[in-house]
Swiss-Prot record:
Protein name: Adenylyl-sulfate kinase
Listed Pfam families: APS_kinase (PF01583)
Protein's pathway: Sulfur metabolism; hydrogen sulfide biosynthesis; sulfite from sulfate: step 2/3
Enzyme class: transferase
Gene designation per UniProt: met14
Reaction it catalyzes: adenosine 5'-phosphosulfate + ATP = 3'-phosphoadenylyl sulfate + ADP + H(+)
Keyword hit for Cytoplasm: yes
Residues annotated as the enzyme's active site: S103
Length: 202
């Protein structure tokens, strides 16, 4: 980190921003295996919240690798950096009173915990959502053909096959995409946000 820099605070307070936008920001961090349903649930949740007056933006694991993280591969070190960057980006969205919905495998607990700490430091809500799905089911879905390629040895360090996935120990929310519909998963997340008074629907 550079040492010849100074943080420049703005003139808009958190309270003012919440008043103008209409609600506080937060990050809803979805984690789970590839093909567990993270992106599908995130898309549905974004649509649901936007249609009800909640400013929401989705950050997708594949999408950010086309730009911001295009220089990163899938080694453990690169995965760590991938999540570190997105943790900061999500925090910026949350600070702007946007509900950031992230869908990243984010296989390592320490990386997810680090993202949580970024938010905690600035008093921003961080809701970890574990999208639970047995690897057998995810492999059967395999919409991108990645599991097949991993089994064939064409993809090294593939989460769930040749690289570990560390499931959350105490996430705020658990949804089971193999037993619950997309609508049921979204409903469970929204109900949590309402119960915690984090959002108000129009």
């Amino acid at each position: 980190m550079a040492t010849n820099i100074t943080f420049h605070p703005g003139s808009v307070t958190k309270e003012e921003r919440i008043k103008f936008v209409g609600h506080p920001g937060m990050t809803i961090w979805m984690t789970g295996l590839s093909a567990s349903g993270k992106s599908t649930i995130a898309c549905a949740l974004e649509q649901y919240l936007l249609q009800r007056g909640v400013t929401t933006y989705r950050l997708d694991g594949d999408n950010v690798r086309f730009g911001l993280n295009s220089d990163l591969g899938f080694s453990e070190q690169d995965r760590n950096e991938n999540i570190r960057r997105i943790g900061h980006v999500a925090k910026l969205f949350a600070d702007a009173c946007v509900v950031a919905v992230t869908s990243f495998i984010s296989p390592y607990r320490k990386d997810r915990d680090q993202a949580r700490e970024f938010h905690k430091k600035d008093g921003l809500p961080f809701i970890e959502v574990y999208v639970e799905c047995p690897v057998e089911v995810a492999e059967q879905r395999d919409p991108k053909g990645l599991y097949k390629r991993a089994r064939a040895g064409e993809i090294k360090e593939f989460t769930g096959i040749s690289a570990p996935y560390e499931a959350p120990i105490s996430p705020e929310i658990v949804v089971s995409s193999h037993t619950q519909s997309i609508e049921e998963c979204v409903e469970k997340i929204v109900n949590y946000l309402l119960e915690k008074d984090l959002i108000t629907l129009k």
